[in-house]
Regions:
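Multi-bladed beta-propeller domains
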Residues: 21-37, 69-87, 116-132, 162-167
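Short, conserved, GDST-rich strand-edge loop motifs in beta-rich repeat architectures
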Residues: 1-13, 54-63, 105-108, 147-161
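Alpha-helix-centered segments that form part of catalytic cores
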Residues: 2-30
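Hydrophobic beta-strand positions in blades of beta-propellers and related beta-sheet-rich domains
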Residues: 16-20, 64-68, 91, 112-116, ...
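Conserved beta-propeller blade repeats
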Residues: 1, 8, 33-54, 82-103, ...
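Loop/turn-rich, solvent-exposed surfaces of beta-rich toroidal or solenoidal domains
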Residues: 98, 103-115, 126-167
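Loop-centered beta-sheet repeat module
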Residues: 29-77
Length: 167
């Protein structure tokens, strides 16, 4: 597919909001309102007060993709400080809520890494190097992971520098 629209939308700096909706009462509350492409909000399992979300766009143009915020709009914080040429993606909560796991990879390198962020301690740590795959999910307590295969990423502006050689 052509990700040109993805790039164009990023550069428009669209007005985006994170909103919670109480399905019983219909009440909606705006948590965050920005002229930045926000996406992929996910509540922390077993904790309705912590939400992960992303600054969306081509990964090589976004300064820091993954963020956390409290449900009341306070304590906005980066999950990971990106290194130059680093992309971080495919974030998900460990189902027990202990950490947000994600994939990290560097421009010009084949290796990908599983990392996790503990929202209670603000600790971001390397778990292990992984085969080139894309979407991951873990079992309940995060000791087993499953992932699908992946080729070269297309969600970056500079696709030539992020080639993955598959077997």
């Amino acid at each position: 597919s052509d990700w040109k629209i993805f790039l164009e939308f990023y550069h428009k700096n669209p007005r985006c909001r994170l909103i919670t909706i109480d399905l019983e009462t219909g009440n909606a509350e705006v948590i965050l309102d920005r002229n930045t492409w926000l996406g992929h909000p996910i509540f922390r399992p077993n904790n309705n007060d912590t939400i992960a979300f992303c600054h969306e766009g081509p990964h090589d143009l976004v300064d820091a993709r993954m963020w956390m915020i409290n449900r009341d709009g306070t304590n906005e914080r980066k999950v990971h400080e990106h290194q130059p040429g680093e992309s971080c993606t495919h974030e998900f909560w460990i189902p027990d809520g202990s950490a947000l796991a994600y994939v990290s990879y560097m421009k010009g390198q084949q290796q990908r890494y599983i990392r996790k962020y503990n929202p209670d301690t603000d600790e971001d740590s390397l778990v292990m190097e992984m085969p080139a795959c894309s979407h991951l999910m873990s079992n309940h307590n995060g000791i087993l992971y499953v992932g699908d295969g992946s080729g070269s990423p297309v969600d970056v502006k500079d696709t030539c520098s992020y080639k993955i050689e598959n077997d």
